[in-house]
Amino acid sequence: MTQTLHALLKAVGLPVPAGVANATVTALTCDSRCVGQGSLFIGLPGERVDGGSFWPAALASGAAAVLIGEQAAAAHPPAPGDSVLVVPDPVAFWAGELASAFWQRPSMRMELIGVTGTNGKTTTTHLIEHLSQACGRPAALFGTLVNRWPGHSLTATHTTAAADRLQAQLAEALEGGTQVAAMEVSSHALDQQRVAGCRFSGAVFTNLTQDHLDYHPSMEAYFEAKALLFASPYLVGEGPRAVVNVDDPWGRQLADRLGERAWRCSLAHEADLTMADLRMTSNGVDGALRTPLGEGRFHSPLVGRFNLMNVLQAVGALLQQGLPLPLLLNALPSFRGVPGRMERIVLTGSAAEDHPAVLVDYAHTPDGLRNALEACRPFVRGQLICVFGCGGDRDRGKRPQMAAIAAALADQVVVTSDNPRTEDPGQILDDVVAGLPADAERQVEVDRAKAIALAIAQARCGDLVLIAGKGHEDYQILGTEKVHFDDREQAEQALRHWR
């Protein structure tokens, strides 16, 4: 892929300096280490250093031109004659728009559905991918666990990738035959303009509960970051293009703002998308799904009321893209779930009833933990045991809240470490335990492996152990180091030693 710098700048409405107008751009990157001959380097501000300060190194590495923001230019002024373009901040916006233009606007040549919210993004995007594929529409998935499209799969490092990589991946997905793409869109990505250059033909709001208040100054700011996805320039197209959970108070506020642009979905009230005649068992749920385009019977193997909302929103989003309801409902039974989301741990060669039930889930917020525990309760014949912790260097306010929820909904609580990061693990546990009632059945074990083993060792047949917080993650962050750690492996090992 090559383009002239003149064409790229003109495509996004930036002025074209005479000195570099005829330069040919062969690659676009925001990483100075990846600059080669003919690259356009865009210097982005970072947490510790401003990437714009690396413009001399980028030019020395052969960059055709460099683009930096006004703040970086003030700190590291380029000399007259340098191939450095200074643009208004935030430079991240221009990075996304230029990357999109360089790759020929890939998001506008597919049906890109963005999913945002505190909980439910991963399951909803996986559902959209699965249902699209089952309906004969090749699909891509961009999210917390994986970025994949036909013929390609790559473990994700962030919920939403940086703009230069994201646009390149969208272009590659398009080349691979993708027609529908489901993307998890985090509040950080929206606030930091990582999805600049994307045009979404559909958007889903799952819910908003306390999380990331170490980053956002308030819940209102957190909401407004999420709401950016549903406004120009991101959400495009005529007619209803959004699916919003109005059982959530923030969702009701968003739906009121969007008006006829949104389909409202609810499990509690009349809405555009609803369910009725529900029958829940350990094998999933059966019921009727009602939409503005008709209704039908469905079966889903997913357990838990919160998963019903994920199903409702995935079906609604794809209906808005023109997929037929009968095909979508027929495809639901074959969706088996997402790794680390209410994942059952069963020993090979052993019947499930021969040992305590063990589930691993990613629940790491107050609402997520409540949903997971409530989903478990109908299937517990004995005691419900909850193992959980809270991440370090993150929102401290949710720690006592999660403890109170665990104590209220579980019979026994084992408090342990999650990802302590650079915070004192003992202090994190103290913050959590402060939320436990004095009479709560609790044990505290800072070593997560020992805590999992302890919970499973004391469980009996008929009990259920929920290990919450890390889900699919196969690492633990201790200090600044990532070490291998997988709740599923630890649970399986503990089950092998269970009496």
Swiss-Prot record:
**Residues noted as binding ATP in the record, renumbered to the chain:** G117, T118, N119, G120, K121, T122, T123
Modification after translation, per record: Carboxylation is probably crucial for Mg(2+) binding and, consequently, for the gamma-phosphate positioning of ATP.
Q: Where in the cell is it found?
A: Cytoplasm
An example Gene Ontology molecular-function term: magnesium ion binding
Q: Which GO terms describe its cellular component?
A: cytoplasm
Keyword Nuclease among record annotations: no
Q: Which residues carry this modification: N6-carboxylysine?
A: K226
| Gene Ontology process terms (BP) | cell division; cell wall organization; peptidoglycan biosynthetic process; regulation of cell shape
**Reaction(s) this enzyme catalyzes, per UniProt:** UDP-N-acetyl-alpha-D-muramoyl-L-alanyl-D-glutamate + meso-2,6-diaminopimelate + ATP = UDP-N-acetyl-alpha-D-muramoyl-L-alanyl-gamma-D-glutamyl-meso-2,6-diaminopimelate + ADP + phosphate + H(+)
Q: Where is this motif: Meso-diaminopimelate recognition motif?
A: 418-421
Binding positions (UDP-N-acetyl-alpha-D-muramoyl-L-alanyl-D-glutamate): S32, T159, T160, S186, Q192, R194
Q: Which UniProt keywords apply?
A: ATP-binding, Cell cycle, Cell division, Cell shape, Cell wall biogenesis/degradation, Cytoplasm, Ligase, Magnesium, Nucleotide-binding, Peptidoglycan synthesis
| Pathway of action | Cell wall biogenesis; peptidoglycan biosynthesis
List the Gene3D superfamilies hit by this protein, alphabetically.
Answer: Mur ligase, C-terminal domain, Mur-like, catalytic domain, MurE/MurF, N-terminal domain
Requisite cofactors? Mg(2+)
Give the EC number(s) under which this enzyme is classified.
6.3.2.13
Residues engaged in binding meso-2,6-diaminopimelate = R394, D418, N419, P420, R421, G469, E473
What role is this protein assigned?
Answer: Catalyzes the addition of meso-diaminopimelic acid to the nucleotide precursor UDP-N-acetylmuramoyl-L-alanyl-D-glutamate (UMAG) in the biosynthesis of bacterial cell-wall peptidoglycan.
**Family under the similarity heading:** Belongs to the MurCDEF family. MurE subfamily.
- Under what name is this protein listed? UDP-N-acetylmuramoyl-L-alanyl-D-glutamate--2,6-diaminopimelate ligase
Species assigned in the record: Synechococcus sp. (strain WH7803)
Source lineage: Bacteria, Bacillati, Cyanobacteriota, Cyanophyceae, Synechococcales
